[in-house]
Each structure stands twice: as structure tokens, then as C-alpha cells.
Regions:
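Nucleotide-sugar donor-binding catalytic core of glycosyltransferases
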Residues: 1-216, 220, 224-243, 255-282
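Short acidic-hydrophobic, aromatic-tinged amphipathic segments that line or gate anion-handling sites
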Residues: 242-250
């Protein structure tokens, strides 16, 4: 299985744009051209047809990111192009629709989509990048291949602080406590993946951003994630088995009755990166 990750979205692009400090967390693949948004002269840039940009450049509140002038620089591109935005926790919000006023932008494929537009296509955060311990895709594939029996019902363990966590995770955590779910121990990555694989369902609220690695870890292991309804989860629930929760205070275990047994995994092949890219016609 060619597991989806942020690096892979970057690597299929012909050119990548970010700030120098972003590169530590991005792909180390040197096959494509990397451009420093603060140093490169974008005037009449003879751009390729597929461009990656670090999605933190969308940020409208941090002075250092605003000063980079991301949108103004995209306006200088000479040729039509599709834009892939990934590799940060920042979301694509209603305000970012002004990007579609740039004549040369055809489609935007973005992580953490928080609005809708006919030319805006959500793409998965997938699993973590290879620089992280929890981005060991070879090990994750080995657990997938082992097909560990699902003997437990709902996995319950996550951090509450940081990013989107502070808004939604306390409500999800309170639901887990109210339902008397056994809270799993925090484990090292490899032990965690093997433990997670034993479950049919998993409480999976938002992460640092709107999307979350946990949801995708679940889907790869054929666990049905239980997620708060938002633009991202609602979109991917059309492709994969995901339980959408509108109100954590109203969620109950009986909502899961028959769900795992009737889960439709017919699109599981789309969890392969190459298949997903073909599905999107990138």
C-alpha cells in the first residue's frame, strides 16, 4: 500500500514554494524545484502546470507569513496551473476563496478545507511524514498486512491541548468519559498501532488542524473513525466509513449498532496514494 502522506502530495508537483523554515518539515526529495517565497523573483514566473505551496502561507494572522505576500506572488505566474496546499495545520477558509480570482489558477487541492467551492478539492492529511517516529509507513504497512482481529469496540485516547484540539477535543473526551469507555494507555508508535488495530471504532476528533492523522490511521486499519462533522469529515465520509457526530453531548454507543457490520470498504483502494491521485485526475 502506497500510504498517503504530506510528502507525497508535495513530491508529485513540479515546483514547491515555502519559507526556508518550513523545509525541515517538508519532503527532502530533490527531484522538483524548491522556491523560497521570500527570496525568489516571481515576476513573470514561467510556472509549470502543478505547483505545491506550504499551506501555512495562507495564514492571515502571523506577521512573518503575511509579509511573504503569497497571494500577490501567485498573481505573477505566467501560465495556468493547479495548486496543491499541504504540510501545515492552517485551514483553507472562506476568505481564501479570493485565490480563485487569479485567472491562472484552475483548481486548488487543499488539506484542512473549511469551506466549499466547485474548484476546491479536499485532500487527506494522510499519515505523518517520514521525519517523525509516527511516520514509519513500512511498519504501518506490516500491521495492515497482519490483519489483526478486531476484538474491541471503541478506542479512546488522545491529547486535548493544542491547535483545534482545545475547541473540540474536550467535548469528545467528555463523551468518552460519560460513556464509560476504557481510556487506552499512551504507547510508543509501534505498540500504539498494534493496539489500535484491535478496535472496530475509534473516537477521532480534530487534530492540530481540522483534519487529523488519527482518522487516516483508522481507515488504513479498517477501523471506523467517529468524527465531529465538518467540511473535511463530511467530504471523506462519502468515500469511506466514517461516523459523523453533530453533537458530542448527544452521542451514544447505540449510534454504532450495526455500523461496523454494514461498513462499505469498496473504496479502500483509494487509500493508496497513486489511486487517490488518479481518482482526482491529478
Amino acid at each position: 500500500m502506497n500510504i498517503i502522506s504530506g510528502e507525497k502530495w508535495q513530491d508529485i508537483c513540479h515546483v514547491g514554494i515555502s519559507k526556508k523554515e518550513h523545509t525541515t518539515f517538508e519532503s527532502s526529495n530533490t527531484d522538483s524545484l524548491w522556491l523560497d517565497i521570500d527570496e525568489f523573483d516571481f515576476e513573470f514566473f514561467n510556472n509549470p502546470s502543478l505547483v505545491y505551496a506550504n499551506s501555512s502561507l495562507l495564514n492571515r494572522f502571523k506577521p512573518k507569513l503575511i509579509e511573504s505576500g503569497f497571494i500577490d506572488k501567485l498573481k505573477k505566474f505566467k501560465n495556468p496551473f493547479d495548486l496543491i496546499l499541504h504540510q501545515s495545520d492552517d485551514s483553507f477558509d472562506e476568505a481564501h476563496k479570493i485565490l480563485f480570482d487569479i485567472p491562472n489558477i484552475k483548481k486548488i487541492y487543499s488539506q484542512n478545507v473549511n469551506t466549499t467551492h466547485e474548484r476546491l478539492i479536499p485532500i487527506p492529511i494522510g499519515l505523518a511524514n517520514s521525519r517523525w517516529e509516527w511516520g514509519d509507513l513500512d511498519y504501518f504497512n506490516s500491521v495492515i498486512s497482519n490483519d489483526i482481529p478486531k476484538t474491541e469496540l471503541v478506542y479512546f485516547n488522545f491529547e486535548i491541548i493544542g491547535g483545534q484540539r482545545k475547541y473540540w477535543r474536550p467535548l469528545c473526551y467528555a463523551a468518552g468519559v460519560r460513556l464509560n469507555l476504557n481510556e487506552s494507555k499512551r504507547l510508543k508508535f509501534k505498540e500504539y498501532v498494534k493496539d489500535l488495530a484491535r478496535y472496530k471504532f475509534c473516537l477521532s476528533p480534530e487534530g492540530n488542524g481540522i483534519d487529523c492523522h488519527r482518522m487516516w490511521e483508522c481507515l488504513y486499519l479498517k477501523i471506523v473513525p467517529i468524527c465531529h462533522r465538518n467540511v473535511v469529515t463530511e467530504h471523506f465520509a462519502k468515500l469511506f466509513p466514517i461516523v459523523l457526530v453533530d453533537d458530542w453531548n448527544a452521542f451514544k454507543l447505540s449510534d454504532l449498532d450495526g455500523v461496523y457490520e454494514s461498513a462499505d470498504w469498496s473504496n479502500y483502494n483509494l487509500l493508496d496514494f497513486d489511486n487517490f491521485a488518479k481518482y482526482l485526475e491529478i
